[in-house]
Amino acid sequence: MGSLQLILVLFVLLSDVPPVRSGVNMYIRQIYDTCWKLKGHCRNVCGKKEIFHIFCGTQFLCCIERKEMPVLFVK
């Protein structure tokens, strides 16, 4: 009878699982949310000190700081 009570207590304690943030690891997410050789970030809107260079997928902008922008040679 004691082991039955112990098992019931364990089931009750294990059924109460605390909420955990699910999803991709934050380090992996950081790699996939970057663009332009890991110097830019994929965002909806670029910040004040950033400029838009290319697209990330179909709906996000690759925002790069001006100092990280590649030099474009023009004839």
From Swiss-Prot:
Signal sequence extent: 1-22
Name of the molecule in the record: Beta-defensin 30
Disulfide bonds: C35-C62, C42-C56, C46-C63
Recorded name of the encoding gene: Defb30
Any Pfam family the entry gives: Defensin_beta_2
Highest rank taxon of the organism: Eukaryota
Keyword Secreted: yes
Function per UniProt: Has antibacterial activity.
Family, similarity comment: Belongs to the beta-defensin family.
Main localization (coarse): secreted
Example of a GO biological process term: defense response to bacterium
Keyword Signal: yes
Keyword terms: Antibiotic, Antimicrobial, Defensin, Disulfide bond, Secreted, Signal
UniProt subcellular location: Secreted
